[in-house]
Amino acid sequence: APAISIFLKPPGVIPPGGSTTICCSCRCDNGNFVLYQNGQQVRTLELRGSRAEFSISNATQKDAGAYSCHYRKGDAVLARSETLEIQVQEFHLPEPVLSVLPGHEVDAGADVVFRCTIAHPKAGCFLYLEGRIQGFPFLSGERDYILSHVHKGNEGRYSCQCFTRGALFEWSAVSKTLDLAVR
């Protein structure tokens, strides 16, 4: 069966009133993508090329939850994606800044350091790569994420988002994006 990927564009926790797009893609022929939220069918889209996009705008808590995509031909479900968690939260922390060393263009095999800088001593952060379902967690206290021996598969659009864990999780906005190219 074809594998389906599901991801958010742009990735990250969304603020109330914010917007994002759920992307479902697979190497499949014509058919339909059915989007499920918390096990309930919410929308169906015909396949356009190899992907379907479901937009969320003016987000509220009703948009939060566990999403998955099913690929259907007729009545047969041919494949299911992993589950994507969408969170809708107010942003209370300052916006972080993402930088990359040694630079935006690196040679294959090099080590790359992503640094997420935020004006908050106790924040932990996630590094996002567009197209990937999960963020990469930074070790708390360390805001550097090291990618060793980079390859073409590491290319893409990165961003970061930070949080504090107290009685409640508090979130920052998502940083501006940064594109990494591997030569």
Question: For each of these PLM feature ranges, what is it?
Answer:
Residues 20, 31, 62-71, 112, ...:
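Conserved Ig-like domain signature around the intradomain disulfide
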Residues 68-90, 159-183:
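Extracellular/luminal immunoglobulin-like beta-sandwich modules
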Residues 9-13, 42-64, 71-76, 102-105, ...:
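Extracellular beta-strand/loop-rich beta-sandwich domains predominantly from IgSF
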Residues 1-8, 91-100:
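Proline-enriched interdomain boundary motifs that mark the N-terminal boundary
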Residues 28-37, 118-131:
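Solvent-exposed loop segments of extracellular immunoglobulin-like
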Residues 11-21, 103-113:
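Short coil/turn motif common to extracellular beta-sandwich-like domains
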Residues 3, 30-32, 95, 122-124, ...:
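Exposed beta-strand and adjacent loop surfaces of beta-rich binding modules
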